[in-house]
Amino acid sequence: MTIALGKFSKDEKTLLDVLDDWLRRDRFVFIGWSGLLLFPCAYFALGGWFTGTTFVTSWYTHGLASSYLEGCNFLTAAVSTPANSLAHSLLLLWGPEAQGDFTRWCQLGGLWTFVAFHGAFGLIGFMLRQFELARSVQLRPYNAIAFSAPIAVFVSVFLIYPLGQSGWFFAPSFGVAAIFRFILFFQGFHNWTLNPFHMMGVAGVLGAALLCAIHGATVENTLFEDGDGANTFRAFNPTQAEETYSMVTANRFWSQIFGVAFSNKRWLHFFMLFVPVTGLWMSAIGVVGLALNLRAYDFVSQEIRAAEDPEFETFYTKNILLNEGIRAWMAAQDQPHENLIFPEEVLPRGNAL
């Protein structure tokens, strides 16, 4: 006979179990292991952005005023990118550029790299939070998969594109008017609106908006008249077993309108997920192409004919001339460190301008 000394209990918890309970079970607001990445990164990204837009100038990097302290408002304030001369330096506070001097670090554009990287990891942390919580309550991870699309766009625009160019300088600054300037830059230097990946992105976003509006209206139109609540939001029990709206009625309605309709809710909702996520992913892939200076569609035959025949012009050739104008007028003021001076005779002129 074997005699065991001591007792074994399944209730004994390791330090990892205690930490897991503290992060995931013992609180009203879920933190989770993903929160160890999400919350610090989100805090630092937002804190850096508010600090930069409130106090920090862009005079030393772009020759611009960019803070509330200098007279900007919410639409014109920004955390601007570092100077072009700093290339792809991480601009660490303790690095060789700032050498631990916080004021100098801000003047050099250190807040931009700080916000960009903490923002990227904060978004990744939020996606992991959705994965973790879905696994905890035994849901499928489609929310997290969908959120990968805006992450792909953020990473491609703010990190991969400038990595393919000469420095962080050519990334968007974090501000409303600054993003508008970046969009004009993308159009003038990359003809972005004629890029097929941009077209797919626009189709995805606008198509998703259309699907969302149609779906919401259809559900409202086909609600069962049930319950004694004062309004739609109180008329149904959230734990009810029966349907809230009539899928059959909705199917018959759209079959009459379009001739075709979704036959079941699974395909309908998957399509509503697929359209915007695919559109954003395609747009992100297109921006990666721009990082490598890949070109959009070029209709050279139209350009040659327009150059030879002053009476021939298409919307494409007009846009090409406008892009030349953006490049010529924007480069000099957008990159003052290059000391670009364009003589009058090389500035674009033509039927479009």
Curated annotation (Swiss-Prot):
Binding, a plastoquinone: 215, 262
InterPro entries in the cross-refs: D1/D2, Photo_II_D1/D2_sf, Photo_RC_L/M, Photo_RC_L/M_CS, PSII_PsbD/D2
The keyword Cell division is assigned to this record: no
Annotated membrane topology: Multi-pass membrane protein
Reactions mediated catalytically: 2 a plastoquinone + 4 hnu + 2 H2O = 2 a plastoquinol + O2
Record: residues binding pheophytin a: 130, 143
GO molecular function terms listed in the Swiss-Prot or TrEMBL record: chlorophyll binding; electron transporter, transferring electrons within the cyclic electron transport pathway of photosynthesis activity; iron ion binding; oxygen evolving activity
Protein's GO biological process: photosynthetic electron transport in photosystem II
PROSITE patterns cross-referenced by the UniProt entry: REACTION_CENTER
Residues that, per the record, bind Fe cation: 215, 269
Entry binding sites for chlorophyll a PD2: 198
Cysteine disulfide links: none
Sites of N-acetylthreonine modification: 2
Binding site for chlorophyll a ChlzD2: 118
EC numbers: 1.10.3.9
GO cellular component: a single term: photosystem II
Sites of Phosphothreonine modification: 2
Top-tier EC class: oxidoreductase
Annotated localization: Plastid, Chloroplast thylakoid membrane
Further remarks about this protein from its record: 2 of the reaction center chlorophylls (ChlD1 and ChlD2) are entirely coordinated by water.
Known function: Photosystem II (PSII) is a light-driven water:plastoquinone oxidoreductase that uses light energy to abstract electrons from H(2)O, generating O(2) and a proton gradient subsequently used for ATP formation. It consists of a core antenna complex that captures photons, and an electron transfer chain that converts photonic excitation into a charge separation. The D1/D2 (PsbA/PsbD) reaction center heterodimer binds P680, the primary electron donor of PSII as well as several subsequent electron acceptors. D2 is needed for assembly of a stable PSII complex.
Sequence similarity: Belongs to the reaction center PufL/M/PsbA/D family.
Record protein name field: Photosystem II D2 protein
